[in-house]
Amino acid sequence: KNPEADYESSIYRLADGRCAIPATAFKAALVGAVRHFDGLTMVQAKAALFVSPEEGTDLVPIVGTPHMREDMVRLESGVADIRYRAGFWPWSATLKVTFLPHMLDVSSVFALVDAAGLGGVGEWRPSAPKSASGSYGMFRVVG
């Protein structure tokens, strides 16, 4: 194992070196949060919402300094292993969300983004399908 290489390879970067998260991770969080609201299905939300990435990429820049995390994971075989990944705390991102106004209004989108933040983005987030015990990647609407 090469912890430093594993850590570096876990970071999404824009061409200018800034750290980022795939826009699709934020969209998936938004779509997943729809289950907590009435009146819109996940299929409808998938078609009604779009998270704009940085131009020319599929990434949303984040503000924060990465640090190396050492996480214990369980492989499919049941064997424990160590993963070295980047963690960011504190961190922030500016999301540009486009939506269909005949399906959602601005206040609904803000509420949806806030709810999506409880499920988080990235590894070991609360809404991760295989490990719902994480607390990383959570966010909230500010400002």
Segments (PLM) and residue ranges:
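RNA-interacting cores
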Residues: 1-143
